[in-house]
Curated annotation (Swiss-Prot):
PANTHER family: 3-PHENYLPROPIONATE_CINNAMIC ACID DIOXYGENASE SUBUNIT BETA, BLR3401 PROTEIN
Associated pathway: Aromatic compound metabolism; naphthalene degradation
Keyword Oxidoreductase belongs to the record: yes
Entry similarity comment: Belongs to the bacterial ring-hydroxylating dioxygenase beta subunit family.
A family per Pfam: Ring_hydroxyl_B
Entry GO terms, CC: catalytic complex
Entry keyword set: Aromatic hydrocarbons catabolism, Dioxygenase, Oxidoreductase, Plasmid
Job description of the protein: Component of the naphthalene dioxygenase (NDO) multicomponent enzyme system which catalyzes the incorporation of both atoms of molecular oxygen into naphthalene to form cis-(1R,2S)-dihydroxy-1,2-dihydronaphthalene. Also able to use styrene as substrate. The beta subunit seems to have a structural role in the holoenzyme.
InterPro entries from the UniProt entry: NTF2-like_dom_sf, Rng_hydr_dOase-bsu
One of the GO BP terms on file: naphthalene catabolic process
Lineage: Bacteria, Pseudomonadati, Pseudomonadota, Betaproteobacteria, Burkholderiales
Assembly mode: The naphthalene dioxygenase (NDO) multicomponent enzyme system is composed of an electron transfer component and a dioxygenase component (iron sulfur protein (ISP)). The electron transfer component is composed of a ferredoxin reductase (NagAa) and a ferredoxin (NagAb), and the dioxygenase component is formed by a large alpha subunit (NagAc) and a small beta subunit (NagAd).
Taxonomic superkingdom: Bacteria
Organism: Ralstonia sp
Name this protein carries in UniProt: Naphthalene 1,2-dioxygenase system, small oxygenase component
Amino acid sequence: MMINTQEDKLVSAHDAEEFHRFFVGHDSDLQQEVTTLLTREAHLLDIQAYNAWLEHCVAPEIKYQVISREFRSTSERRYQLNDAVNIYNENYQHLKVRVEHQMDPQNWANSPKIRFTRFVTNVTAAKDKIVPDLLHVRSNLILHRARRGNQVDVFYATREDKWKRIEGGGIQLVERLVDYPERILQTHNLMTFL
């Protein structure tokens, strides 16, 4: 099945390519493996085992990016303005600093302790056509963050990941692009890992 972006004008070329990648060469075993992987990653982040997450899930060459897109009317698209703005654009060292900040006993945001619940859904996975150990993974995320009785935030996002198989049988995250749909944050902050 192919998507004709000339007929389906609301579908971007990127989205059509992603659809083709994930649904034409569907592999049920890979799908199950990746779903289990993302579930384990979500569990580590939910229980705030950030050092374990960095050590076991994140590759040293990670590119971790959270963007927000500006939604324009069709008539405004002719100006070719960049529609994506970085909220985070980080590497391994930046993530490590954020983890250290979370672990700091002086971090007032963790008193009382924050509770997280992540729902990772609509998981699709495909092997890279050129690099056999590279996996393309797309998922949707709902993150519920609760602190005290009255501070509750809910985040929704779409994630496009690249995971690579490493020696010893593990799989590590090498790239994560989080498409966060809110242009203006409706929460206190976005100090979390999506």
